[in-house]
UniProtKB/Swiss-Prot annotation:
Belongs to the RimM family. The keyword Cytoplasm applies. GO terms for biological process: ribosomal small subunit biogenesis; rRNA processing. This is Ribosome maturation factor RimM. PANTHER family: RIBOSOME MATURATION FACTOR RIMM (PTHR33692:SF1). Its main location: cytoplasm. Keywords: Chaperone, Cytoplasm, Ribosome biogenesis, rRNA processing. Residues 99-186 form the PRC barrel domain. An accessory protein needed during the final step in the assembly of 30S ribosomal subunit, possibly for assembly of the head region. Essential for efficient processing of 16S rRNA. May be needed both before and after RbfA during the maturation of 16S rRNA. It has affinity for free ribosomal 30S subunits but not for 70S ribosomes. GO terms for cellular component: cytoplasm; ribosome. InterPro entries: PRC_barrel-like_sf, PRC_RimM, RimM, RimM_N, RimM_N_sf, Transl_B-barrel_sf. Pfam families: PRC_RimM, RimM. HAMAP family: Ribosome_mat_RimM (MF_00014).
Length: 192
């Protein structure tokens, strides 16, 4: 059932005595926490995502945290019981994006190529959020010189690539392809 949902945050704590919840966001779209409507909730150990109504929400400035109110959560004890739960939004309700903006689900599994040589570097397997987004790229087996420097096994070596225009000049969703122009040493020093 997860294929119908996008993870948008994790409930980290109760807020006050009225059943409000603090949610650490992994979404770039505030409306997912502020606009009333159906969301999904899933326990900390995974399992089924069940639907729940978001009644309201507000941002805590500068913290990447939102305070939300869910239907049926009326007091601090009920809110505390939801600590660690994941909050999900329906994939069909994706906000509109500007040019050169992408949903994480569109980037994962795209093949990554060197912009100048055309050599396949790997596949995007994850995205991390920092000062800017970072692509986790599972490296191709033929990149032995890079992988030798990796603390991981050969089959698991990943490079972390900043998702900025200067380093990622091309994203072609139709061709399922990303091209990168890494400065010298970027792939070697950013192994995970």
């Amino acid at each position: 059932m997860e294929e119908n949902w996008l993870e948008i945050g994790t409930i980290v704590a109760p807020q006050g005595l009225e059943g409000e919840l603090r949610v650490l966001s992994v979404s770039d779209f505030p409306e997912r926490f502020q606009k009333r409507g159906m969301r999904g909730i899933q326990g900390p150990q995974g399992g089924e995502i069940r639907e729940i109504t978001l009644l309201r929400g507000r941002e805590l400035p500068g913290k990447n945290v939102y305070v939300i109110k869910l239907e049926g959560v009326e007091n601090r004890e009920q809110a505390e019981a939801l600590r660690g739960y994941k909050l999900w939004a329906n994939k069909l309700e994706k906000p509109r994006l500007k040019a050169d903006e992408y949903h994480v689900s569109e980037l994962v599994n795209l093949e990554v190529y060197h912009h100048l040589t055309g050599e396949k570097i790997g596949v995007v397997v994850d995205i991390f959020w920092a000062g800017n987004d970072i692509l986790a790229v599972q490296l191709e087996a033929n990149l032995a010189s890079v992988k030798k420097k990796s603390p991981s096994s050969d089959s698991e070596a990943r490079a972390l690539v900043p998702f900025v225009k200067e380093i990622v000049p091309l994203v072609d969703l139709k061709a399922a392809r990303i091209e990168i122009a890494p400065p010298p040493g970027l792939l070697e020093i950013n192994l995970s």
